[in-house]
Structure formats: structure tokens, C-alpha cells
Amino acid sequence: MIDLAAVEQALALLFTNFSPWMVVVPGIIIGLIFGATPGLQISMAMAIFLPMTLYMDFVQAMLFLTAIFTGGSFGSGIPAILMNIPGTSSAIATAFDGYPMARQGKHNQALGVALASSVIGVLMGYLILFLMIQPLSFMVLKLGPAEMFAVILWGMTLIATLRGEHMLKGLMAGFVGMLVGTIGFNELGMARGTMGQTFLLDGVPVIPAMMGMFAASELFKLANKGYIVESEASRKVKISEIFQGFKMAVTYPWVLIRGGFIGVFVGAVPGVGSSVSNLLSYVETQRRDKDPSSFGKGNPKGVVASESANSTSEAGSMATLLALGIPGGGATAVMLAAFAMHNITGGPQFIRQQTDVVYAIIFANFAQVFLLMVIGLLFIPLLANIVKVPMRYLIPSVLVLAVMGSFGLTGNMTGPATVLIFAVVGWLLRHYGYSVPAAVIGMLLGAMAEKSLLHSYQISGGNLAYVLERPVTLIILALLLISLFGQHLVNWFRRRRQPLGA
């Protein structure tokens, strides 16, 4: 139920003086820069600038950190579209169709689609948060480790179906990725798959591996090309085409709405967030489309699905932070630290006692959406010029960027070595028709799946009947089976219903 008195107080907090808004534009710019730079994480940006929030009041601090979050969510899609390097794991699906659009000379439209989808996604996400923060937090509390494991398996199954007729290859790639993701210490302190190498005790660095498999392996294919976009006329940066991308995104309202709801609800699950939601949204959009084979070849619906879910995930993770005091991921973990610095404890009591502050944070993000649109439009033409750079300069530049970013993440040569090794792995997967995205997602979710499975085993005492007592788990497992066999069953029934003479 909406507290109208708290709404009035929230508006007073935001608009009585201009000071809360002084930090929003710098925050969005910081987020855009960190999100658009491969190897730099949104949570890293927030952590670096966290000490500055000591000199702000709580509302101003939240506006600053959420502005970084908002800018970074869009920024991570820019290198995914222009260079096939997702700035963060939340932009993996953006690269599936965004990069092919750029290769076709539609980089301006692709960036416009991404910006419009991000803007609408943030707006939709915080609107859902405003209306549903309390019931949403109650639903999240119902999800235990068994449900988490089922969600991860379902997500992996959906990613595998991206291969269409090569589903088995997709499943195999995802399974191998999950095995790689479990290398290192497990929850019980046991080391697995390290082959005696101490640098693997902490596991394979996922972000450098992702850079290698997506970006560096793609460079092998482009080595004999002159430019990313071969046509000189198509390499021009045109504001009019960026606005065409804006209009294009709005023509797919159901894709935006579906991505928005997937982003909010999956983003609200701690530890899952936008890394999974953008992929689930992409796969669901492809599955429901009249021409699923066009995805992965430059279909703008793929960019819309990914970016809308990616952006609304922010609101979902904020729901668990505000309503339960539980961070949904790295970015909201930094926000939780800001809560502690200002002697604030998130949770049901916080919502009841400081509803005006909660509403102020939500309303401020409505305004941030329009600032993101303006700043994004100024930012895009600058970055879109990358398609004008000859490949003889771009390939070494991207490799140096990937190597430097990976070194910054690990602090030693493990990161650069991981990039190069997984570049070869990515090239081999592409060459033999296996799904690179499925392998990467398997790596991202492998440790999470193992942790959830172990906790489920400990809670149930090894009793499989425990699953039968969890209706949500059964529903998710049913969805998993539908995603695997649903289309085959539909086709079978259609054949049965056709007259014999037809």
C-alpha cells in the first residue's frame, strides 16, 4: 500500500534544496566510463568513490551510488556492441545481436536501441519497485538454496537452447563451463581441479576468461579485415540513426515489458542478478519470436531484451537491499557499506520507519533516467567513432585493453594468461560449433550452483523427497522441462492434428 504522506515527505527531501542533485551527473558519468571500460566493474567504481559519501547525507549518498549503478548498467553494453567485449557479465546477451548489428554498419542504431532500452528499463524497474517493494521482498524470502539451484539449472538449459538444432552442443559447452567454474576451493575448503597450481586455488578468473572467449577469440576472425564495418559509408556516426534506434526500441513494447519483469524478479534474487536476467530475457524473447533464427545475426529485439532486463535488475537488487538488508550483488554490497557508514540498517523496520527515504531514492531514480538519456546521447557519438579505427590498430588496442584490464583484476600475470588461454578455447568452440555464451555462463554459475546444491543437501540430510515439499522448486523444474522439450511436444501435437491427406 502506498503511503501518500511519505510520498509528500520524499518529494520535500529531494526538492527542498538542490544539493542532492549535485552528485547525480558526476555519478552517471563515472558509471558510464567504468561500465564502458572492459575489466572495470560497476562495483569497483562504487567502492572507489564510497569514501566520498562520508561527506554527504544519506539520501545524497544513495543518489550518488545509484547514479553510478545506472550509468554503468548502460555503459557495459557499449563495448559489447562495438567490440564484442561485454563491459560486465550483465551485458553478455547484448553482444549476441549488438555486435552483428555493428558489423553490418548499424552501430548507431544498435547504440540507440541499447540506450532507449536502458532508459525505459530503469524507469520500469523503479516503477515496479515503488508499487511492489514489500510483496517482492516477501517472495524473495521464500527462495531457498533448492530454488536457487533449480533457477541456475533452468538458466543453463535456456542458454543451451540458443543453439537451436545444436542443443546438445550447447548443453555440453555449458556443462564444461560449470566444471571450469568449480575449480578451486569449495564451501568445505577442499581444492578441486587445480592440477597442483596454487594460482588456481581461488578459481579461474571469470572476467578475464570472458574477455578471452568473447573478444580475443573474435579478433582471430577479424585479423584479415580492414575495419569492423567494411563499408566506408556505414562507418559514419549519425545522430539521426541513433534516434532511429530509439524509435526501434519503442516498437517492441512486449519485449521491453517482459525484459523488465524478468529483470526485476531475477535481480531481486541475491547472488543471481543481471548476470542471469539479461540472458533469460534474451532466450525468452528468441523462443517467442516468429523468426528465432534471426537472433544472433543482428536482430534489434535481442538488444532490447538484454538491455531492458539488465537495467531493471538494478531495481530488483535494490528491493532486497531496502526491504531485507541483503545485497543482491557486488554493487548493492557497496551500498550496504554506505548504509553502515550512515548508521542505517536496511530491512522491514527501515521501510516502516523511513518510508519517505525509500520513496526519495526511488523517485530520484525516475529523474536519473532522463539525465542518463541526455548524457548517453552526448557520450555515444564519441564512442561510436571506434568503427572508423582500422583493424591493424584496433586489434592490438583491444588486446592491450583486455590484458591491462585483466591484470588490474588479478594483480598478477594470471589475468593476462587467462585471457590468452581462453581466447584459444573460445576460437576452438566457435570453430567446432559449440556455444561460447553457454560455456561462459556455465563458468559464471558453476560455483553458485555447487554452493546451492551443497546447502540443499545439508538442509535435507540427503533426502531427495525434500524437493517434493518445495512447490516453487517443482514449478521451476517444470519450466526447465518445458524449455527443453516444450517445442518438440508442440510440434508433435501439430503433426498429430494435421489431416493425413494434408
Task: Identify what each model region corresponds to.
Residues 1-61, 193-299, 384-385, 401-407, ...:
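Helix-loop-helix hairpins and the membrane-proximal interhelical loops
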Residues 48, 82-109, 135, 144, ...:
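Flexible loop linkers connecting adjacent transmembrane helices
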Residues 26-42, 71-84, 159-164, 261-270, ...:
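Transmembrane alpha-helix interface/packing and boundary motifs in multi-pass membrane proteins
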Residues 112-227, 341-495:
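Membrane-embedded alpha-helical modules
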Residues 33-43, 81-92, 124-128, 266-276, ...:
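Short helix-coil transition sites and intra-membrane helix breaks within transmembrane domains
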Residues 41-52, 65, 80-100, 131, ...:
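Re-entrant/interfacial helical elements at transmembrane boundaries that shape
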Residues 69-80, 299-324, 328, 346-375:
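A structural-propensity feature for long, helix-poor, extended segments
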